[in-house]
A protein has these predicted regions:
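Residue-level signature of the transmembrane alpha-helical core
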Residues: 23, 113-117, 158, 162, ...
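Membrane-interface helix/loop boundary segments of multi-pass membrane proteins
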Residues: 121, 170-198, 212, 238-246
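Membrane-interface capping segments at transmembrane-helix boundaries
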Residues: 34-41, 91-99, 293-304
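Alpha-helical transmembrane segments in multi-pass membrane proteins
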Residues: 5-93, 111-114, 141, 151-160, ...
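C-terminal membrane module of polytopic membrane proteins
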Residues: 216-222, 243-248, 252-304
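Juxtamembrane "helix-exit" motif on the non-cytosolic side of transmembrane helices
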Residues: 2-10, 59-70, 129-136, 207-214, ...
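Central hydrophobic cores of alpha-helical transmembrane segments
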Residues: 46-55, 194-200, 248-259
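Membrane-helix boundary elements
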Residues: 198-219
C-alpha cells in the first residue's frame, strides 16, 4: 500500500499493481501446497505461476522507484509468455494431477455456455440501463457508439486474448473459488461461507480502491467494490458448483467481467473514477437483483 501511495503522489501509473495483485491468491495457495510437500502437485504449472507472481511483484516495486512508461508493457509481455507456458504445462500434465488439484478441463460445456451467455446479457443490460439513467444526451451518444464497428471488433479480439492473458484471472479464482470458498463453507455453511469470501474478496481490493480505481472518492469505491464482490462471488460460486467444480468457468466469467469493460465503454482505463453515492445505490440494486437470487440455488441449500 505505501508503494501505491508513492506512485500516486508522484503521478505515476499504478496499473501494474492491479495486474500483479491478481496473481497473489493462487500463488499463496500453490506455495503452501508445495511447502507442505503435498503429493502429486502439478509442480511445473505451480512454479510457473509463483515465478510470474514474483516477477510481477518485483516490477511493481521497481516501478515506484525507477519510473518509466514501459513497466506496464513489460508486465503485459510477462503475462502473455506465462499464460502460453501455462497452457502448455496444463495440457501436457497428467490428468490425475489436474483432477486432484482442481485443474480439470472437462465439464458441462453447454451449461457453462449458458451461464456465460446469461452473464454477458445481464451485465450488458446493466451498462445500458446505467447510461440511460444519465439522460438523453448520454444515451444518444452511447447508441451511436454501438452503431460503429468498434465494440464488435473489440469483442471479437477478446476471444483469442483470453488464451494469452488467462493467468491473472486464474490467479484470483484459484485462490478465492477453489481454495478459500470450500474452506469457509465447511466452517460457516454454504451461503455464509460464500458471502464471507465475497467480503474478503472486496476488502482485498482496498489498496486499489484507495490509490488506483478512485482516489478522490475512495469510500464510495470501497462500498461499491464490496457490493460487486459479494454479489459476483455468489454467482461465480454457483457457476463453479453447477459445472462440477470446474474452476475454468469462474476464470472465464472473471475475464469477461474485467475485459468487457473495453467493449462496454470503449476504454480499458478504469483508474481515477469519480463515484457518487447514487452510483453506489444503483449498482447495489442492479447487482443484488441480478445475482443474489442465486443464493436459492441447490448448491447453497446444503449445510446452511
Amino acid at each position: 500500500m505505501p508503494l501505491l501511495y508513492i506512485c500516486l503522489h508522484n503521478g505515476r501509473d499504478t496499473s501494474i499493481f492491479a495486474n500483479a495483485q491478481m496473481f497473489y491468491p493462487a500463488a499463496g495457495v500453490m506455495l503452501a501446497f508445495l511447502l507442505a510437500r503435498r503429493q502429486g502437485t502439478p509442480k511445473r504449472f505451480y512454479i510457473l505461476h509463483i515465478a510470474a507472481a514474483a516477477l510481477m511483484l518485483a516490477m511493481s516495486v521497481l516501478s515506484a522507484f525507477l519510473p518509466q512508461e514501459s513497466w506496464l508493457n513489460i508486465a503485459n509481455f510477462v503475462i502473455i509468455i506465462a499464460s502460453v507456458l501455462g497452457w502448455i504445462f496444463l495440457l501436457t500434465e497428467k490428468k490425475t494431477k489436474r483432477e486432484d488439484y482442481g485443474l480439470h478441463l472437462h465439464g458441462k460445456f453447454l451449461t457453462a455456455f449458458a451461464i456465460c451467455a446469461y452473464f454477458l446479457v445481464v451485465k450488458t443490460g446493466m451498462v445500458f440501463l446505467s447510461v440511460a439513467l444519465q439522460g438523453g444526451d448520454a444515451w444518444a451518444e452511447y447508441l451511436t457508439y454501438w452503431q460503429s464497428s468498434a465494440p464488435w471488433l473489440m469483442a471479437l479480439v477478446l476471444v483469442p486474448n483470453f488464451f494469452l492473458s488467462f493467468l491473472p484471472f486464474f490467479g484470483e479464482e484459484y485462490g478465492w473459488r477453489y481454495y478459500l470458498t470450500p474452506a469457509l463453507q465447511g466452517r460457516f455453511g454454504a451461503r455464509r461461507g460464500a458471502l464471507a469470501v465475497g467480503v474478503l474478496w472486496g476488502l482485498w481490493h482496498l489498496p486499489l480502491n484507495l490509490f488506483f480505481y478512485s482516489p478522490d472518492t475512495s469510500l464510495q469505491s470501497i462500498t461499491a467494490q464490496l457490493v460487486v464482490c459479494v454479489t459476483l462471488g455468489v454467482f461465480f460460486t454457483f457457476a463453479y458448483e453447477k459445472c462440477g467444480k470446474n474452476i475454468w468457468l469462474p476464470v472465464v466469467l472473471h475475464y469477461l467481467n474485467n475485459s468487457m469493460v473495453l467493449v462496454w465503454t470503449g476504454t480499458a482505463d478504469i483508474s481515477n473514477q469519480i463515484i457518487s453515492w447514487t452510483d453506489v445505490a444503483i449498482s447495489a440494486i442492479m447487482y443484488g437483483v441480478v445475482f443474489l437470487p442465486f443464493l436459492a440455488a441447490k448448491c447453497y441449500r446444503k449445510n446452511k
